[in-house]
A protein has these predicted regions:
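Soluble small-group transferase modules, centered on the S-adenosyl donor enzyme superfamily
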Residues: 216-283, 289-293, 303-306, 450-520
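A short glycine-rich, Lys/Arg-flanked "PGG" loop and its adjoining helix->strand segment in the class I
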Residues: 402-415
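Conserved glycine-rich SAM-binding loop
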Residues: 318, 322, 393
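Alpha-helical transmembrane segments of multi-pass membrane proteins
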Residues: 2-253, 264-268, 278-281, 305, ...
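Glycine/threonine-rich flexible loop motifs
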Residues: 394-401
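S-adenosyl-L-methionine
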Residues: 349-380, 385, 394
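A cross-kingdom signal targeting lumenal/periplasmic-facing segments of multi-pass membrane
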Residues: 315, 323-334, 340, 345-348, ...
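Extracytosolic and intramembrane catalytic regions of membrane-associated proteins
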Residues: 286-316, 326
Length: 520
Protein backbone atom coordinates (compact mmCIF):
# COMPACT_ATOMS: atom_id res chain seq x y z
CA UNK A 1 0.00 0.00 0.00
CA UNK A 2 1.38 3.37 -0.99
CA UNK A 3 1.90 6.14 1.58
CA UNK A 4 0.02 9.46 1.32
CA UNK A 5 1.85 12.39 -0.29
CA UNK A 6 3.89 14.40 2.17
CA UNK A 7 2.77 17.98 2.92
CA UNK A 8 6.36 18.89 3.65
CA UNK A 9 7.51 17.82 0.23
CA UNK A 10 4.90 20.09 -1.29
CA UNK A 11 6.14 23.24 0.50
CA UNK A 12 8.19 25.69 -1.61
CA UNK A 13 11.88 25.94 -0.89
CA UNK A 14 12.85 28.83 1.42
CA UNK A 15 14.28 31.88 -0.36
CA UNK A 16 18.04 32.03 -0.62
CA UNK A 17 19.71 34.29 1.95
CA UNK A 18 21.55 37.29 0.45
CA UNK A 19 25.27 36.85 0.33
CA UNK A 20 27.10 39.74 2.01
CA UNK A 21 29.07 41.85 -0.43
CA UNK A 22 32.43 41.95 1.29
CA UNK A 23 35.87 41.86 -0.27
CA UNK A 24 38.94 40.23 1.10
CA UNK A 25 40.23 41.48 4.42
CA UNK A 26 42.96 44.09 4.40
CA UNK A 27 46.39 43.30 5.82
CA UNK A 28 46.27 44.01 9.55
CA UNK A 29 48.93 46.71 9.31
CA UNK A 30 47.07 48.56 6.55
CA UNK A 31 43.77 48.30 8.40
CA UNK A 32 45.36 49.68 11.57
CA UNK A 33 47.00 52.55 9.64
CA UNK A 34 43.75 53.58 7.95
CA UNK A 35 41.85 53.67 11.24
CA UNK A 36 44.69 55.48 13.05
CA UNK A 37 45.16 58.01 10.24
CA UNK A 38 41.48 58.80 9.64
CA UNK A 39 40.70 59.12 13.36
CA UNK A 40 43.71 61.37 13.86
CA UNK A 41 42.71 63.53 10.90
CA UNK A 42 39.32 64.20 12.53
CA UNK A 43 41.03 65.53 15.66
CA UNK A 44 43.40 67.70 13.62
CA UNK A 45 40.33 69.21 11.95
CA UNK A 46 38.63 69.74 15.30
CA UNK A 47 41.66 71.44 16.85
CA UNK A 48 42.41 73.69 13.88
CA UNK A 49 38.71 74.55 13.41
CA UNK A 50 38.80 76.51 16.66
CA UNK A 51 41.56 78.71 15.26
CA UNK A 52 39.87 78.94 11.89
CA UNK A 53 36.59 80.33 13.26
CA UNK A 54 38.13 82.29 16.16
CA UNK A 55 38.81 85.51 14.21
CA UNK A 56 35.12 85.75 13.33
CA UNK A 57 33.20 84.51 16.39
CA UNK A 58 35.84 84.56 19.14
CA UNK A 59 37.26 81.73 21.22
CA UNK A 60 34.68 81.48 23.99
CA UNK A 61 33.31 78.52 25.89
CA UNK A 62 30.34 78.52 23.51
CA UNK A 63 32.62 78.36 20.47
CA UNK A 64 34.73 75.58 21.98
CA UNK A 65 31.59 73.65 22.93
CA UNK A 66 30.22 74.12 19.42
CA UNK A 67 33.41 72.75 17.82
CA UNK A 68 33.36 69.69 20.09
CA UNK A 69 29.62 69.13 19.62
CA UNK A 70 29.63 69.51 15.84
CA UNK A 71 32.69 67.26 15.55
CA UNK A 72 31.01 64.57 17.66
CA UNK A 73 27.84 64.87 15.58
CA UNK A 74 29.89 64.46 12.41
CA UNK A 75 31.66 61.41 13.86
CA UNK A 76 28.33 59.84 14.86
CA UNK A 77 26.73 60.52 11.48
CA UNK A 78 29.79 59.35 9.54
CA UNK A 79 30.19 56.15 11.55
CA UNK A 80 26.50 55.33 11.20
CA UNK A 81 26.50 56.02 7.47
CA UNK A 82 29.76 54.14 6.95
CA UNK A 83 28.36 51.09 8.70
CA UNK A 84 25.15 51.27 6.66
CA UNK A 85 27.09 51.47 3.40
CA UNK A 86 29.44 48.66 4.46
CA UNK A 87 26.45 46.28 4.57
CA UNK A 88 25.33 47.23 1.06
CA UNK A 89 28.51 47.66 -0.94
CA UNK A 90 31.98 46.22 -0.97
CA UNK A 91 33.92 48.40 1.50
CA UNK A 92 37.04 48.01 -0.64
CA UNK A 93 35.38 50.19 -3.26
CA UNK A 94 34.42 52.88 -0.72
CA UNK A 95 37.55 53.39 1.37
CA UNK A 96 39.66 55.26 -1.18
CA UNK A 97 36.80 57.56 -2.30
CA UNK A 98 36.01 58.40 1.34
CA UNK A 99 39.58 59.54 1.96
CA UNK A 100 39.85 61.48 -1.30
CA UNK A 101 36.49 63.18 -0.70
CA UNK A 102 37.59 64.07 2.83
CA UNK A 103 40.72 65.66 1.36
CA UNK A 104 38.64 67.66 -1.11
CA UNK A 105 36.24 68.78 1.64
CA UNK A 106 39.17 69.82 3.83
CA UNK A 107 40.68 71.92 1.02
CA UNK A 108 37.33 73.58 0.33
CA UNK A 109 36.79 74.31 4.03
CA UNK A 110 39.35 77.13 4.10
CA UNK A 111 37.80 79.46 1.51
CA UNK A 112 34.26 78.57 2.61
CA UNK A 113 34.92 79.53 6.24
CA UNK A 114 36.83 82.69 5.35
CA UNK A 115 34.19 84.01 2.99
CA UNK A 116 31.33 82.94 5.27
CA UNK A 117 33.12 84.30 8.32
CA UNK A 118 33.03 87.82 6.90
CA UNK A 119 29.23 87.52 6.80
CA UNK A 120 28.72 85.65 10.08
CA UNK A 121 30.95 87.80 12.31
CA UNK A 122 29.88 88.13 15.94
CA UNK A 123 29.03 85.94 18.87
CA UNK A 124 25.44 84.99 18.01
CA UNK A 125 24.75 81.32 18.70
CA UNK A 126 23.36 80.74 15.20
CA UNK A 127 26.45 82.26 13.58
CA UNK A 128 28.77 80.18 15.76
CA UNK A 129 27.00 76.90 15.01
CA UNK A 130 26.77 77.55 11.27
CA UNK A 131 30.39 78.62 10.89
CA UNK A 132 31.65 75.67 12.94
CA UNK A 133 29.51 73.28 10.91
CA UNK A 134 30.99 74.67 7.69
CA UNK A 135 34.47 74.15 9.12
CA UNK A 136 34.12 70.64 10.49
CA UNK A 137 31.08 68.59 9.58
CA UNK A 138 31.58 67.29 6.04
CA UNK A 139 35.26 66.25 6.19
CA UNK A 140 34.86 64.83 9.70
CA UNK A 141 31.82 62.77 8.69
CA UNK A 142 33.65 61.35 5.67
CA UNK A 143 36.65 60.42 7.80
CA UNK A 144 34.46 58.85 10.49
CA UNK A 145 33.02 56.50 7.84
CA UNK A 146 36.43 54.88 7.32
CA UNK A 147 36.53 52.89 10.57
CA UNK A 148 33.26 50.94 10.09
CA UNK A 149 34.26 50.19 6.50
CA UNK A 150 37.58 48.76 7.68
CA UNK A 151 35.91 46.85 10.52
CA UNK A 152 33.49 45.18 8.10
CA UNK A 153 36.37 44.01 5.92
CA UNK A 154 38.27 42.56 8.85
CA UNK A 155 35.36 40.55 10.30
CA UNK A 156 36.18 37.29 8.53
CA UNK A 157 35.79 35.14 11.65
CA UNK A 158 32.76 35.78 13.86
CA UNK A 159 34.55 34.12 16.76
CA UNK A 160 37.02 37.04 16.77
CA UNK A 161 34.51 39.87 16.35
CA UNK A 162 35.12 41.35 19.79
CA UNK A 163 38.87 41.21 19.37
CA UNK A 164 38.80 42.86 15.92
CA UNK A 165 36.35 45.60 16.87
CA UNK A 166 38.10 46.29 20.17
CA UNK A 167 41.55 46.44 18.59
CA UNK A 168 40.50 48.80 15.80
CA UNK A 169 38.51 50.99 18.20
CA UNK A 170 41.56 51.27 20.44
CA UNK A 171 43.78 52.13 17.47
CA UNK A 172 41.32 54.83 16.38
CA UNK A 173 41.30 56.34 19.86
CA UNK A 174 45.09 56.27 19.94
CA UNK A 175 45.15 58.06 16.58
CA UNK A 176 42.88 60.78 17.94
CA UNK A 177 44.99 61.24 21.07
CA UNK A 178 48.21 61.40 19.07
CA UNK A 179 46.78 63.94 16.64
CA UNK A 180 45.39 66.12 19.43
CA UNK A 181 48.71 66.31 21.26
CA UNK A 182 50.74 66.74 18.07
CA UNK A 183 48.48 69.51 16.78
CA UNK A 184 48.18 71.35 20.09
CA UNK A 185 51.81 71.19 21.14
CA UNK A 186 53.63 71.29 17.79
CA UNK A 187 51.66 72.08 14.64
CA UNK A 188 49.65 75.08 15.87
CA UNK A 189 52.77 76.70 17.33
CA UNK A 190 54.86 76.07 14.22
CA UNK A 191 52.50 76.45 11.26
CA UNK A 192 49.65 78.64 10.05
CA UNK A 193 46.18 77.12 10.00
CA UNK A 194 46.18 77.39 6.20
CA UNK A 195 49.33 75.28 5.96
CA UNK A 196 48.04 72.67 8.41
CA UNK A 197 44.72 72.21 6.63
CA UNK A 198 46.15 72.19 3.10
CA UNK A 199 48.81 69.70 4.19
CA UNK A 200 46.10 67.53 5.74
CA UNK A 201 44.00 67.78 2.57
CA UNK A 202 47.00 66.77 0.48
CA UNK A 203 47.84 63.87 2.79
CA UNK A 204 44.25 62.60 2.69
CA UNK A 205 44.18 62.83 -1.09
CA UNK A 206 47.51 61.04 -1.51
CA UNK A 207 46.61 58.27 0.94
CA UNK A 208 43.25 57.82 -0.78
CA UNK A 209 44.81 57.65 -4.24
CA UNK A 210 47.53 55.29 -3.03
CA UNK A 211 44.98 53.06 -1.33
CA UNK A 212 42.82 53.00 -4.44
CA UNK A 213 45.79 51.97 -6.58
CA UNK A 214 46.73 49.23 -4.12
CA UNK A 215 43.21 47.81 -3.86
CA UNK A 216 42.62 47.82 -7.62
CA UNK A 217 45.94 46.05 -8.12
CA UNK A 218 45.03 43.38 -5.58
CA UNK A 219 41.43 42.98 -6.69
CA UNK A 220 39.83 45.07 -9.46
CA UNK A 221 37.14 47.21 -7.84
CA UNK A 222 34.73 49.60 -9.49
CA UNK A 223 34.84 53.10 -8.06
CA UNK A 224 31.44 54.57 -7.15
CA UNK A 225 29.93 57.30 -9.32
CA UNK A 226 30.30 58.27 -12.97
CA UNK A 227 33.70 59.35 -14.27
CA UNK A 228 32.51 62.92 -14.88
CA UNK A 229 31.43 63.30 -11.27
CA UNK A 230 34.80 62.05 -10.05
CA UNK A 231 36.58 64.50 -12.35
CA UNK A 232 34.37 67.36 -11.12
CA UNK A 233 35.22 66.54 -7.51
CA UNK A 234 38.92 66.55 -8.33
CA UNK A 235 38.56 69.99 -9.91
CA UNK A 236 36.62 71.16 -6.84
CA UNK A 237 39.46 70.10 -4.57
CA UNK A 238 42.04 71.92 -6.67
CA UNK A 239 39.82 75.00 -6.80
CA UNK A 240 39.41 74.93 -3.02
CA UNK A 241 43.17 74.81 -2.54
CA UNK A 242 43.61 77.66 -5.00
CA UNK A 243 40.90 79.81 -3.42
CA UNK A 244 42.58 79.35 -0.05
CA UNK A 245 45.44 81.51 -1.27
CA UNK A 246 43.17 84.40 -2.32
CA UNK A 247 40.37 84.14 0.25
CA UNK A 248 40.32 87.03 2.75
CA UNK A 249 42.76 86.21 5.55
CA UNK A 250 42.31 88.19 8.78
CA UNK A 251 45.84 87.38 9.97
CA UNK A 252 49.27 88.79 9.20
CA UNK A 253 50.69 86.20 11.53
CA UNK A 254 49.23 83.35 13.57
CA UNK A 255 50.72 82.99 17.01
CA UNK A 256 50.08 80.06 19.30
CA UNK A 257 47.03 81.91 20.68
CA UNK A 258 45.96 84.62 18.26
CA UNK A 259 45.34 85.66 14.70
CA UNK A 260 47.28 88.93 14.74
CA UNK A 261 47.53 91.88 12.39
CA UNK A 262 49.18 95.30 12.65
CA UNK A 263 47.75 98.15 10.59
CA UNK A 264 49.02 101.69 10.07
CA UNK A 265 46.86 104.67 11.05
CA UNK A 266 46.26 106.73 7.89
CA UNK A 267 45.63 109.86 9.97
CA UNK A 268 48.73 109.46 12.15
CA UNK A 269 51.86 108.26 10.32
CA UNK A 270 53.48 106.81 13.44
CA UNK A 271 50.28 105.21 14.75
CA UNK A 272 49.84 101.44 14.71
CA UNK A 273 46.80 99.34 15.62
CA UNK A 274 47.15 95.75 16.81
CA UNK A 275 44.21 93.54 15.92
CA UNK A 276 43.79 90.16 17.60
CA UNK A 277 41.22 87.81 16.11
CA UNK A 278 40.00 90.73 13.95
CA UNK A 279 39.20 92.93 16.98
CA UNK A 280 41.10 96.11 17.82
CA UNK A 281 43.26 95.31 20.82
CA UNK A 282 45.97 97.96 21.18
CA UNK A 283 47.11 101.25 19.68
CA UNK A 284 50.65 102.59 19.91
CA UNK A 285 52.41 105.65 18.58
CA UNK A 286 55.90 104.62 17.56
CA UNK A 287 57.19 108.18 17.88
CA UNK A 288 55.33 109.22 21.05
CA UNK A 289 54.79 106.56 23.75
CA UNK A 290 52.89 109.13 25.83
CA UNK A 291 50.11 109.23 23.25
CA UNK A 292 47.13 107.12 24.30
CA UNK A 293 44.42 106.55 21.70
CA UNK A 294 41.92 104.28 23.41
CA UNK A 295 39.80 105.59 26.26
CA UNK A 296 40.58 102.77 28.67
CA UNK A 297 44.33 103.30 28.27
CA UNK A 298 43.78 106.97 29.10
CA UNK A 299 41.99 105.87 32.28
CA UNK A 300 44.85 103.56 33.24
CA UNK A 301 47.28 106.37 32.49
CA UNK A 302 45.26 108.76 34.67
CA UNK A 303 45.39 106.37 37.64
CA UNK A 304 49.09 105.78 37.06
CA UNK A 305 49.71 109.52 36.91
CA UNK A 306 48.32 110.09 40.42
CA UNK A 307 49.45 106.81 42.01
CA UNK A 308 52.67 108.53 43.12
CA UNK A 309 54.23 112.00 42.90
CA UNK A 310 54.95 113.10 39.33
CA UNK A 311 58.12 111.62 37.90
CA UNK A 312 58.64 109.12 40.71
CA UNK A 313 59.57 105.66 39.50
CA UNK A 314 57.23 102.75 40.13
CA UNK A 315 57.55 99.01 40.31
CA UNK A 316 54.77 98.02 37.91
CA UNK A 317 53.46 94.57 37.04
CA UNK A 318 51.41 94.07 33.87
CA UNK A 319 49.16 91.02 33.46
CA UNK A 320 48.95 90.85 29.68
CA UNK A 321 51.17 92.72 27.26
CA UNK A 322 49.22 93.06 24.03
CA UNK A 323 50.70 96.06 22.25
CA UNK A 324 52.68 97.11 25.37
CA UNK A 325 50.98 100.52 25.29
CA UNK A 326 50.83 101.07 29.06
CA UNK A 327 54.36 99.81 29.84
CA UNK A 328 55.75 102.17 27.18
CA UNK A 329 53.67 105.03 28.64
CA UNK A 330 54.97 104.46 32.16
CA UNK A 331 58.54 104.21 30.89
CA UNK A 332 58.12 107.60 29.20
CA UNK A 333 56.26 109.38 32.01
CA UNK A 334 58.12 107.86 34.94
CA UNK A 335 61.74 107.21 33.91
CA UNK A 336 63.33 104.37 35.82
CA UNK A 337 60.04 102.53 36.31
CA UNK A 338 60.43 98.76 36.40
CA UNK A 339 57.80 97.35 34.03
CA UNK A 340 57.48 93.58 34.34
CA UNK A 341 55.06 92.18 31.76
CA UNK A 342 53.53 88.71 31.95
CA UNK A 343 52.34 87.73 28.46
CA UNK A 344 51.18 84.22 27.65
CA UNK A 345 51.75 84.60 23.91
CA UNK A 346 55.42 84.71 22.96
CA UNK A 347 54.39 85.54 19.40
CA UNK A 348 52.93 88.85 20.58
CA UNK A 349 56.16 89.71 22.37
CA UNK A 350 58.09 89.12 19.13
CA UNK A 351 55.52 91.10 17.14
CA UNK A 352 55.78 93.98 19.61
CA UNK A 353 59.53 94.11 19.20
CA UNK A 354 59.31 93.92 15.40
CA UNK A 355 56.43 96.29 14.66
CA UNK A 356 55.18 98.10 17.78
CA UNK A 357 58.28 99.82 19.10
CA UNK A 358 58.83 97.57 22.12
CA UNK A 359 62.41 97.88 23.36
CA UNK A 360 63.23 95.34 26.08
CA UNK A 361 65.69 96.53 28.70
CA UNK A 362 66.12 97.17 32.42
CA UNK A 363 62.90 99.22 32.49
CA UNK A 364 60.79 96.84 30.37
CA UNK A 365 60.97 93.08 30.78
CA UNK A 366 58.59 90.55 29.25
CA UNK A 367 58.18 87.05 30.64
CA UNK A 368 56.25 84.56 28.52
CA UNK A 369 53.85 82.45 30.53
CA UNK A 370 50.46 82.26 32.19
CA UNK A 371 49.89 85.28 34.44
CA UNK A 372 48.19 83.22 37.16
CA UNK A 373 51.20 80.94 37.50
CA UNK A 374 53.73 83.76 37.27
CA UNK A 375 52.01 86.01 39.82
CA UNK A 376 52.11 83.14 42.30
CA UNK A 377 55.91 83.25 42.08
CA UNK A 378 56.23 87.00 42.69
CA UNK A 379 57.50 88.28 46.07
CA UNK A 380 54.99 89.67 48.56
CA UNK A 381 54.67 93.49 48.69
CA UNK A 382 56.84 93.92 45.60
CA UNK A 383 54.73 96.13 43.28
CA UNK A 384 53.35 99.66 43.48
CA UNK A 385 51.01 99.23 40.52
CA UNK A 386 49.46 96.09 39.01
CA UNK A 387 47.73 96.46 35.64
CA UNK A 388 45.36 93.68 34.59
CA UNK A 389 44.78 93.87 30.84
CA UNK A 390 44.34 90.26 29.74
CA UNK A 391 40.60 90.27 28.94
CA UNK A 392 39.39 90.57 25.35
CA UNK A 393 36.00 91.53 23.97
CA UNK A 394 34.95 87.89 23.54
CA UNK A 395 37.71 85.99 25.33
CA UNK A 396 38.16 86.04 29.09
CA UNK A 397 40.72 83.80 30.82
CA UNK A 398 38.36 82.89 33.65
CA UNK A 399 41.16 81.86 36.03
CA UNK A 400 42.36 85.48 36.04
CA UNK A 401 38.92 86.71 37.11
CA UNK A 402 38.51 84.85 40.40
CA UNK A 403 38.81 85.83 44.04
CA UNK A 404 41.85 83.60 44.43
CA UNK A 405 43.60 85.53 41.66
CA UNK A 406 42.61 88.86 43.24
CA UNK A 407 44.01 87.64 46.56
CA UNK A 408 47.34 86.83 44.94
CA UNK A 409 47.42 90.27 43.29
CA UNK A 410 46.72 91.89 46.68
CA UNK A 411 49.58 89.88 48.18
CA UNK A 412 51.99 91.16 45.53
CA UNK A 413 50.78 94.77 45.82
CA UNK A 414 52.56 96.93 48.39
CA UNK A 415 50.56 98.66 51.14
CA UNK A 416 48.97 101.66 49.48
CA UNK A 417 49.62 100.22 46.03
CA UNK A 418 46.96 100.17 43.32
CA UNK A 419 45.43 97.41 41.19
CA UNK A 420 43.68 98.41 37.96
CA UNK A 421 41.83 95.86 35.86
CA UNK A 422 40.37 96.37 32.40
CA UNK A 423 37.09 94.53 31.78
CA UNK A 424 34.90 94.52 28.68
CA UNK A 425 31.20 93.82 29.13
CA UNK A 426 27.85 94.35 27.45
CA UNK A 427 24.32 94.91 28.76
CA UNK A 428 23.01 93.59 31.10
CA UNK A 429 26.53 93.98 32.61
CA UNK A 430 26.52 90.78 34.64
CA UNK A 431 30.24 90.15 34.28
CA UNK A 432 31.51 93.58 35.36
CA UNK A 433 29.24 93.49 38.42
CA UNK A 434 30.54 90.05 39.37
CA UNK A 435 34.15 91.10 38.83
CA UNK A 436 33.64 94.21 40.96
CA UNK A 437 32.21 92.04 43.74
CA UNK A 438 35.19 89.71 43.35
CA UNK A 439 37.83 92.44 43.58
CA UNK A 440 35.97 94.10 46.46
CA UNK A 441 36.11 90.81 48.38
CA UNK A 442 39.91 91.23 48.58
CA UNK A 443 40.58 94.98 48.33
CA UNK A 444 39.11 97.29 50.93
CA UNK A 445 38.71 100.27 48.60
CA UNK A 446 37.31 99.90 45.08
CA UNK A 447 36.18 102.35 42.37
CA UNK A 448 34.95 102.00 38.80
CA UNK A 449 35.71 104.13 35.74
CA UNK A 450 33.32 103.83 32.78
CA UNK A 451 31.29 105.89 30.30
CA UNK A 452 27.88 106.96 31.68
CA UNK A 453 26.12 105.31 28.71
CA UNK A 454 27.70 101.98 29.62
CA UNK A 455 26.76 102.34 33.29
CA UNK A 456 23.18 102.96 32.16
CA UNK A 457 23.30 99.66 30.22
CA UNK A 458 22.84 101.45 26.90
CA UNK A 459 25.98 100.01 25.28
CA UNK A 460 28.93 97.72 25.78
CA UNK A 461 32.24 99.23 26.80
CA UNK A 462 35.52 98.92 28.60
CA UNK A 463 35.28 99.25 32.36
CA UNK A 464 38.26 99.96 34.61
CA UNK A 465 38.21 98.57 38.14
CA UNK A 466 40.53 100.35 40.59
CA UNK A 467 41.36 98.64 43.88
CA UNK A 468 43.63 99.25 46.84
CA UNK A 469 43.96 98.34 50.51
CA UNK A 470 44.27 102.07 51.26
CA UNK A 471 41.83 104.90 50.49
CA UNK A 472 42.03 105.79 46.81
CA UNK A 473 42.97 109.35 45.73
CA UNK A 474 39.55 109.76 44.12
CA UNK A 475 39.62 113.54 43.73
CA UNK A 476 43.03 113.44 42.08
CA UNK A 477 41.82 110.67 39.76
CA UNK A 478 38.70 112.69 38.88
CA UNK A 479 40.77 115.76 38.13
CA UNK A 480 43.12 113.81 35.87
CA UNK A 481 40.22 112.06 34.12
CA UNK A 482 38.64 115.45 33.45
CA UNK A 483 41.78 116.33 31.50
CA UNK A 484 42.06 113.16 29.42
CA UNK A 485 38.40 112.06 29.06
CA UNK A 486 35.93 114.61 30.44
CA UNK A 487 32.81 112.53 29.71
CA UNK A 488 33.80 109.45 31.71
CA UNK A 489 32.30 108.67 35.13
CA UNK A 490 34.01 107.57 38.34
CA UNK A 491 31.83 105.45 40.61
CA UNK A 492 32.66 104.76 44.26
CA UNK A 493 31.07 104.40 47.68
CA UNK A 494 27.31 103.93 47.90
CA UNK A 495 26.81 104.50 44.17
CA UNK A 496 29.18 101.64 43.39
CA UNK A 497 27.53 99.41 45.98
CA UNK A 498 24.14 100.04 44.36
CA UNK A 499 25.59 99.30 40.93
CA UNK A 500 27.09 95.96 42.04
CA UNK A 501 23.96 94.88 43.88
CA UNK A 502 23.89 91.18 44.79
CA UNK A 503 26.38 90.13 42.12
CA UNK A 504 28.19 86.85 42.71
CA UNK A 505 31.83 86.58 43.73
CA UNK A 506 33.75 84.51 41.18
CA UNK A 507 35.91 81.71 42.57
CA UNK A 508 38.15 79.00 41.18
CA UNK A 509 35.35 76.57 41.95
CA UNK A 510 32.67 78.54 40.12
CA UNK A 511 33.39 81.28 37.58
CA UNK A 512 30.87 81.14 34.69
CA UNK A 513 32.36 84.15 32.90
CA UNK A 514 31.22 83.14 29.40
CA UNK A 515 27.64 82.82 30.58
CA UNK A 516 27.86 86.15 32.41
CA UNK A 517 29.13 87.79 29.22
CA UNK A 518 26.29 86.42 27.11
CA UNK A 519 23.98 89.21 25.99
CA UNK A 520 20.97 87.00 25.25
Amino acid sequence: MSSPPSDVAALPAPPAQPVPITGRALPNGLAAFLVFFSSGAVLVLETVALRLVGPYVGVTLQVTSSVIGIALAAIAYGAWTGGWLADRRDPRGLLAPALVLAGIATAVTLPVVRYAGEVLRGGAASAILLLVALAVFVPAALLAAVTPLVVKLQLADLRRTGQVVGRLSGIGTLGGITATLLTGFVLVAALRSTVILLALALALGLVGIGLGWYLRREEPTELPGPARARAALAVLGLAGAGLSTVAPNPCDIETAYHCARVTADPSRPSGRTLLLNSAQHSYVDLADPKYLEYAYTKWIGAVGDVAAPAGQRLDALHLGGGGFTVPRYLTATRPGTDNLVFEIDGGLVELGEQELGVRPGPDLRAVVGDARMLVAGEPTDSRDLVVGDAFGHLVVPWHLATREMAADVRRVTRPGGVYVQNVIDYPPLRFIRAELATVAAEFGHVALIAPPEALAEEQGSNFLIVGSDAPLPLEAVRARLAEVDPKVSLLSGAALTDFVGQAMVLTDDYAPVDQLLATA
